[in-house]
């Protein structure tokens, strides 16, 4: 599980920091060597933060000169609604020094984050839209409020989006890229999820505006710090465009437990962005995955066409709602379509319905609770302690 946060918070809280325990108890094979995320305590000022960064830079330079370390030091700083953190590439001596600073809340190892999609099935039926707009299964028509997310901005934090795809014509722009220098979707995952949350044909919120935020490579992987950097950008962008309270964010990705990842999405939600997250595809308790385990966000598990839990879907008390995730047809780069399965496909259904609710006047703070309230209690064998509620858009059908 690799839950470093518990260890690092404890280490940061005691007077004599046993940094050896931190390095020894890394856990998992997803740790990025010598890469860390440092989170400051609440209340640390901008001046204190800058002073800390300067001190870390000096310490890193000194240690690098002494030991010939090839680490590069501080990389990016984050400020998500007052949550201050940074990531970097440091040797152990520098991390030991960082852990001793009383302004530091915790340090955790940066880890690999991957998309949450599984298989492709050619010519599978398009069933998700009909299912989320009817109380009974088997309906092919999608019934929805005509506002359809109009006036809402949805950030697709993923592998990028094919912004030239006709599904998004006139409603999409490229945002930022935290993983490479290729501002395209070389994987297809991000285009597919965007097609579900806001595509003209395959989407739920058909009139919402879309922003492509690339945090995963064409191979479908990235880092926790790269995802946090993308989320930070989204909050800053929404604030600059007066879109807080009128924005949603889809995260069809995840990794092992990360308190920093959970903190970042929580602050984004608190800032005024509805956040939908994939529960994960390991058929295990989602409490062990991030950012799915963040209580503040709307965590989506995956259902099948016959209202059962998808065999791969994570479950648990942290799951807020089930949504269609098996064999979902949506957009593919180059103007085509593709069928994918995964909680990655469930999350954008939730994101789209959430965005549509925001357009109807439901607040960001109330949106997930509203989805849980009106969801249909139809999922069979949802998993131990897991809701049996299936996503419903309240169409009345």
From Swiss-Prot:
Conditions for induction: Expression is up-regulated during infection.
Disulfide bond sites: none
Sites where a glycan is attached: 250, 393
Active site, UniProt feature: 158 (charge relay system), 189 (charge relay system), 344 (charge relay system)
EC number: 3.4.21.-
Keywords on record: Glycoprotein, Hydrolase, Protease, Secreted, Serine protease, Signal, Virulence, Zymogen
GO biological processes: proteolysis
InterPro entries: PCSK9_ProteinaseK-like, Peptidase_S8/S53_dom, Peptidase_S8/S53_dom_sf, Peptidase_S8_Ser-AS, Peptidase_S8_subtilisin-like, Peptidase_S8_subtilisin-rel, S8pro/Inhibitor_I9, S8pro/Inhibitor_I9_sf
Main location per the UniProt record: secreted
A Pfam family matched in the record: Peptidase_S8
Signal peptide location: 1-19
A GO MF label: serine-type endopeptidase activity
Enzyme class: hydrolase
Domain Peptidase S8: 126-397
Residue ranges listed under propeptide: 20-116
Cell compartments where the protein resides: Secreted
Coiled coil among keywords: no
Ranges of residues in domain Inhibitor I9: 35-116
GO CC annotation, single: extracellular region
Keyword Glycoprotein: yes
Family the entry assigns: Belongs to the peptidase S8 family.
Function statement: Secreted subtilisin-like serine protease with keratinolytic activity that contributes to pathogenicity.
Protein name: Subtilisin-like protease 3
